[in-house]
Amino acid sequence: MFELAVKYIFSRKLQSLLMLIGVAFGCGGYIVFTSIQTGFQNFLKERLIENNGHITIRSREDYITPDSLAGVFFEGKRIYWITEPSGKRSHDYLQSAWYWQKLLEKLPYVVASTRRIEATTTCSRASFSRSISLRGVDPVNEPKVTNIAEDIIEGKLQMLSSGNNMVIAGVELLKFLGAKVNDTINIINPDGHVYPVKVVGIYSSGDRRNDESLVLGSITTVQNILESPGKITKIVVKTIDANKAAVFAQKLSQYSYDKVESWDQANVNFLSMTKQQSLIRQITMFTFILVVSFGIYNVLNMMVHQKQ
């Protein structure tokens, strides 16, 4: 049967050539479409991982419900609430940061970890002001976990250690404030206290949202601004395999009551979108194969009828 099909294909060279060109264009289009889609997905995943690490450890947030208070009042008794309790229990800062730091150094699946302190504050210069995301980082350990240092287009991350009032600001934020490197800007903490800081670098990630709001400082600098000495809000971890981050996060969650979350757990909606895109790609491939197969069958069928 195969020999017969080959014979008929080569007997009508022009038709076979046109069929081959059609198949080639179809295959090429599918390959380009798949490459663009897959490349875009991988790029977004890399950006998520590069900026936020594989695993994040932060203070746990618990919602208050009637079940969560079972046994607190009148243990063993059934309680009927006139107004059901609600709300949320949480800590602004990680209570066991140093414990985590020592533990992570001993685990074989942890490559590196770094501490952070983050808060939403306000930045101003002259009559201009804007809400910002203030992030205190460790200039030594941060590059081991994320690629944030590669997004600094002027200055270096290590310059944050040269003083207690040095910051690196997003390029769009500096444009809005009309500031540049070596200028002084003001950061207003949640209590309304103003702290002047010196811009020693410019950050540009290509993400306009970050570039308009992110301000980096050393951990000590940000602790001073927030008036929270020794406080840490999160620990970011890099593991030996980003694809197994959820498994490693599950293991880490057994060591403490703190919230341990992998990058894929924190971006469920994004991963759901990529799965839908992959499904669409598979359907497209199946449809393409079906159309090509039917086209080849029609060509061969026409050749057989012409021979008759």
Residue ranges and their predicted role:
Residues 2-10:
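A short amphipathic helical element positioned immediately N-terminal to and/or at the very start
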Residues 13-40, 275-308:
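Hydrophobic alpha-helical transmembrane segments of multi-pass inner-membrane transport and secretion
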Residues 37-131:
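Hydrophobic, regular-secondary-structure patches
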Residues 52-55, 108-111, 177, 230, ...:
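Structural motif
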Residues 61, 189-281, 288:
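Mechanotransmission and gating elements of multispan inner-membrane complexes involved in transport
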Residues 67-68, 88-95, 124-131, 143-148, ...:
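Solvent-exposed, non-transmembrane alpha-helical starts
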Residues 116-119, 128-138, 153-220:
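Hydrophobic secondary-structure segments that place a key small or acidic residue at a functional site
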